[in-house]
Amino acid sequence: AADSDLERVMKERNLSEKDVLAAAKTYQPTGRKDDYMVFSSGGQSGQVLVYGVPSMRIYKYIGVFTPEPWQGYGFDEESKAVLRSGSINGKEINWGDTHHPNFSEKNGEYVGDYLFINDKANPRIAVINLSDFETTQIVVNPVIKSDHGGSFVTPNTEYVIETSQYAAPFDNDWHPIEEYQAVYRGAVTLWKFDYDKGKIDVNKSFSLELPPYMQDLSDAGKGESFGWAFTNSFNSEMYTGGIEKGLPPMEAGMS
């Protein structure tokens, strides 16, 4: 009977054996746990998306840089305070562009007590406690103006690494693009993380000045490369575009 029912459904829905096998590979009966959970950056939603594998069920949208009405994030006093801590120059910024989440580590292995996520549009890092999937802290980088370096950590989560993407003047004043090589700069910030408290310690964090290249992703070494950190860069020629003059646009013209 089961075979005949399956054959009937396949015929009614015009499904091949390959289609049915694909569905069976992702199906999880109610009450059965997924083998894996994925923590994915939500991009310009400003959130973190959590879903299961193989079921692909969405478990939660973790509110991070943007209010989430259905879970009350950004509406109670505690989460309002977290969002306000991400204000820049006194202005509340309740949106973000999340990129490259990373788990906390011990001895270079993921332990997953905490998740870190950066905001590419605004230079911020958020800390998410994975005991309850709640954002507990947002810190603003006072040096850089954008980031894309991910939020990867040193092997025992002593530091969270944040790197600028686009170079900008450190003095926050306007400078013409002709001063790019002389005035514009990038930076890599190492945020000190207090593992027991689950919070970034801003006062014990520091930044290193970088040339005005474009930085991409950063990570800390492990094993033989322990003690080193690595950041890949492009545009070492410090090209500044000029599409209005018939030159290639910024990233298309960079090496």
Where are these regions (language model features)?
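Conserved beta-strand positions in repeat-built beta-propeller and related beta-rich domains
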Residues: S40-G43, L115-K120, I161-Q165, A229-F234
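A short beta-strand motif characteristic of beta-propeller blades
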Residues: R13-K18, R57-I62, N89-G96, E134-V140, ...
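Beta-propeller domains
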Residues: S41-G86, I117-P142, Q181-V183, F193-D201
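Short coil/turn segments that connect the beta-strands within blades of beta-propeller domains
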Residues: D34-Y36, G112-Y114, N156-E158, E224-G227
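Short, conserved, GDST-rich strand-edge loop motifs in beta-rich repeat architectures
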Residues: K25-D35, H100-N102, G112, E162-Y184, ...
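Structural signal for beta-propeller blades
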Residues: V48, P123-A126, P169-F170, V188, ...
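Repeated scaffold domains used in trafficking and secretory/extracellular systems
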Residues: D19-Q28, E68-D76, S85, K91-N107, ...
